[in-house]
Amino acid sequence: MSPQTETKASVGFKAGVKDYKLTYYTPDYETKDTDILAAFRVTPQPGVPPEEAGAAVAAESSTGTWTTVWTDGLTSLDRYKGRCYHIETVVGEENQYIAYVAYPLDLFEEGSVTNMFTSIVGNVFGFKALRALRLEDLRIPTSYSKTFQGPPHGIQVERDKLNKYGRPLLGCTIKPKLGLSAKNYGRAVYECLRGGLDFTKDDENVNSQPFMRWRDRFLFCTEALYKAQTETGEIKGHYLNATAGTCEEMMKRAVFARELGVPIVMHDYLTGGFTANTSLAHYCRDNGLLLHIHRAMHAVIDRQKNHGMHFRVLAKALRMSGGDHIHAGTVVGKLEGEREMTLGFVDLLRDDFIEKDRSRGIFFTQDWVSMPGVIPVASGGIHVWHMPALTEIFGDDSVLQFGGGTLGHPWGNAPGAVANRVALEACVQARNEGRDLAREGNEIIREASKWSPELAAACEVWKAIKFDSNQ
């Protein structure tokens, strides 16, 4: 053994395994303004104390490993380690705890959501000491959020680009999502936009399949968009999905969309990946394109209540990575979404400063220091009878997206769009006149349907449609 090796191995080093809590559980720690803070829902294995479980999470998501290593002596663990600084019991749940962990900012690469998630959730979720683990929330310090561009444009710039104010925007996903030719697809786009919608949308899995290659779809949709704009005098958009198998191909599609002069493109940010999404967001800001984000695959990550990651974390990550719209559930449609929790992460998307509010699932006060906001998109099983509730819940800075609720109209696509536009305008006018949308919503829709046969037909078709788990 060389003298150098003897020195390294002998000074202050004791080989073996020791409890994580001896190093990583620090209840006296005072968090810094520059720390990234995380709230984990921890379910320890039987016999594992909550302090050890919380410390294990802090260790395995920062500097720790399963045994002591002599190279610990070559750095300052106190400077770089994550710290579990507080643990609280989850009321009403057996053997579940909220473990609060603080991470020094130096652990993370600037401007990289990919690196942030790789560190915090990349490895620890398979840890044997834990029966289940869920990341409930993150506090992003201002010193870190300022290293991100964020959304390409944000809410106010989008309003100005579209010249549309004072109401939610209306959208529609073209159905059937797969199987249409590019020309028939473009026809549906035209009919919906001509009928009064602001946007139409590629579905998340419409990329470039044999029945409809991306370039053909882009061309026919652009033709439809320009024709509808000419006839209505309104600025229209279609979310052209640029998601592809490689980043290079994705960028090629975005470049072609810009050359066509369309206002907006789309990306599946979870299946496409945060690195690809951030690159696309930067391109969109540099080239004047709005960016619509679909959250395909989110329920794989966020649906389980005790394991995975809450969508509010994915929403914060998207605001940092970049997107002007993101799907956010409906509260009232076919997809899951609890009202207060949904409104909590909607505020995290749109607002500049959000106070801690545990009743809405917000574990930390978040200051975005003027990072542009993201417009939430309500989509999934909604129709004209939902319009009052959606207008009241989501407010003006939202996109209300009716796929089947437009294309399923008994008279066709354009009448379906007319029905939705009439219903929305009626709800906005009623709200502005001081009427209570929550209490008078159905009456408002019935009144409007008396002078709109398209709305009356839609009301009749969907009058008894509900998405209850007991059906």
UniProtKB/Swiss-Prot annotation:
Modified residues annotated as N6,N6,N6-trimethyllysine in this record: K14
EC number: 4.1.1.39
Compartments it resides in: Plastid, Chloroplast
Positions of the pro-segment in this chain: 1-2
Post-translational events: The disulfide bond which can form in the large chain dimeric partners within the hexadecamer appears to be associated with oxidative stress and protein turnover.
Main location: plastid
Binding site for Mg(2+): K201, D203, E204
Signal peptide: none
PROSITE patterns per UniProt: RUBISCO_LARGE
Site positions per UniProt: Transition state stabilizer: K334
Subunit annotation: Heterohexadecamer of 8 large chains and 8 small chains; disulfide-linked. The disulfide link is formed within the large subunit homodimers.
Additional comment: The basic functional RuBisCO is composed of a large chain homodimer in a 'head-to-tail' conformation. In form I RuBisCO this homodimer is arranged in a barrel-like tetramer with the small subunits forming a tetrameric 'cap' on each end of the 'barrel'.
Protein name: Ribulose bisphosphate carboxylase large chain
Organism: Drymophloeus subdistichus (Palm tree)
